[in-house]
Every structure is written in C-alpha cells, then in structure tokens.
Amino acid sequence: MIKLKNFAELNSQEIKLIFKWRNHPDISQFMKTKHIDFEEHLRFIRNLHQDSNKKYFLVFQDEQIIGVIDFVNITTKSCEFGLYAIPDLKGVGQVLMNEIKKYAFEILKVDTLKAYVFKDNHKALKLYQQNHFTIYDEDKDFYYVCLKQSHCKALPS
C-alpha cells in the first residue's frame, strides 16, 4: 500500500532524513542546486505551508519510505514534477511515477505533466519514456518532457 505524507506534516526525524538524502551525491548530482545547508532546508519546508503552487510528499510503500515526489508551478492546466528514490534503494522508480501520475491527474486534475531531465540522467529519461512522456524541447543541459492526460493509460488504483 502506498501512502503520501505532505512535507508540511513531517516529523523532525523525517526532515533530517530528507535533508541527508537530498544532499547525497547520487541525488544531488541531478538537482539544479547541488548542495543545501540545513537552515535552507528548514526554511524551504516552512515556506511550503504558504505556497499553494508547490506540493512535496514523502512516499511510503508498506510503511517503508521509498522516496520523494513533488509538484511545482501548479496551474489548472499543468504542473511540473520531480522525484527521487532514497539512496541505494532500487526498483521503485515506476512506483513513484505511478503516484505522480495519479496525484497530478486525479487530485490536481491537470491536463499536462511536465519535467526537465539532465541530459546525462539516462535512468530518469528511460523511465519517463517508458511512461509515454515525450521530449518537447531541449537546451545544452536538459531535455524537457511532458505527458498529456489523454495519452495516459488507465492508472492503477
């Protein structure tokens, strides 16, 4: 069973874990901001309380934390998303992607899901393409991908 826990409801232990994972080299290498300090992290989480354009979730599978998913630039038509599995945990990318699609299309009710992918993040790009995302733009560092709800297969419940 999958459970999402809003970052606004995290306990202090979870906040510290996310901080540690976020700065882990396997994760931070694919972030625009490579390293954050703990004060920045706390400020970011506090600011989420007032920001309706952003939603961040800790993802649990059968009571075990498996990763983080987020939604930013949320409008009635689209949103951008991000995800990462906790370091050294393999095989949960598709689970996280399923939760992203369910939340975006069923809760946020957007038509289009968007993301940017570092060009050297081959695992993420492969996951997105397996989920029918298409590349709609690129620059020297990133591919920009999107998925329209109309192209989405029935979502597992």
From Swiss-Prot:
CDD domains: NAT_SF. It comes from the Bacteria. Residues 5-152 form the N-acetyltransferase domain. Gene3D superfamilies: 3.40.630.30. One of its GO terms (molecular function) is acyltransferase activity, transferring groups other than amino-acyl groups. Its EC number is 2.3.1.-. Keywords: Acyltransferase, Transferase. The keyword Acyltransferase applies. PANTHER family: GNAT-FAMILY ACETYLTRANSFERASE, SPERMIDINE N(1)-ACETYLTRANSFERASE. Catalyzes the third step in the biosynthesis of pseudaminic acid, a sialic-acid-like sugar that is used to modify flagellin. This is Acetyltransferase PseH. It comes from Campylobacter jejuni subsp. jejuni serotype O:2 (strain ATCC 700819 / NCTC 11168). The gene is pseH.
